[in-house]
Amino acid sequence: MDSSAKGSKKDAPDGPPKDSKLPVSEALLDYHREIKENAVERFMFHIKKLREKNQKYQERNRRLKEEQNWHIKNLIKELKEKNLDEAPIVTREEVEEAMKEKWEFERQQEASLKEMRIQINEAEKLFLEKLSEKEYWEEYKNVGSAQHAQLIVSLQNDIDTVKENAEKMSEQYKVTLEDEKKRISRETMIQLKQRKEWATQHAVRFIDKNNYREIWENDWLKKEGDTASFGNVLSLLDFLPPDLHTAEPCVSSGQSRGSLRILAPFALQLWSKLSGLLPTLVTPDPVCIIWSFGPGQTNSMAICP
């Protein structure tokens, strides 16, 4: 086909007749075109040869591949026959034992798989819990922590305010308490003074002429008891009867209830001073009239001269 094309190309008129003269540039281009066409024809012929050679090589490779597969199959068959000839004889018991081992292994694998599934489920639950906890703490970090911080600051301010108010109230209560104590003490002194005056006025109403000497003696004993020294106390004891602790109580016929009320406190005050100075000289005796001035006996007892 290529040769016929080549012949046709050679037979076909190429360019203008020979007698016509062509320019130099066109003649040069025609020459280069002929060179390229010859080169293309040579390349096409070479490619054709290569294709034929490639086809032959492919046929040979296919045949070699088939022979290789046939030899491999024969070798495998021979190897299997050789292994079967050399393999030991397996009994029924060995097969059953192998099957039991295989079944036991499968059961163990199933149990381990079941346990692994349980562990995976627990791990997934734990992961979900931790994930929810993480989301909660992230939300708390982003939102709740700021709110709680503001709440803590507010509560701290409230606590400080309450403490400050409590301190102020405590100071105010202390001042009020001191004022109340002073007021109560002042009113108590006033009431005591008034009651003393009222008692004196009430006692004066019942005093007669015979009791003025007794009042004067009581005033003298009071002054002496307040200012007397140890020697004066001893001199006062000389005027008392030696059996004072066993003396019988007596009541003067001219004494009234008012004089007894006045005498009793002074007698008790005198005895308290004497007992403080001389605790061992006189033995207390509930029979003695000086110790007998109790709340219920001051109206009926007095010291007899």
Curated annotation (Swiss-Prot):
Protein name listed in UniProt: Coiled-coil domain-containing protein 83
Lineage: superkingdom: Eukaryota
Keyword Phosphoprotein: no
Ranges for region Disordered: 1-25
Coiled-coil residues: 37-186
Keyword Coiled coil tagged: yes
Lineage: Eukaryota, Metazoa, Chordata, Craniata, Vertebrata
Stretches with biased composition (Basic and acidic residues): 8-21
Protein keywords: Coiled coil
Protein source organism: Mus musculus
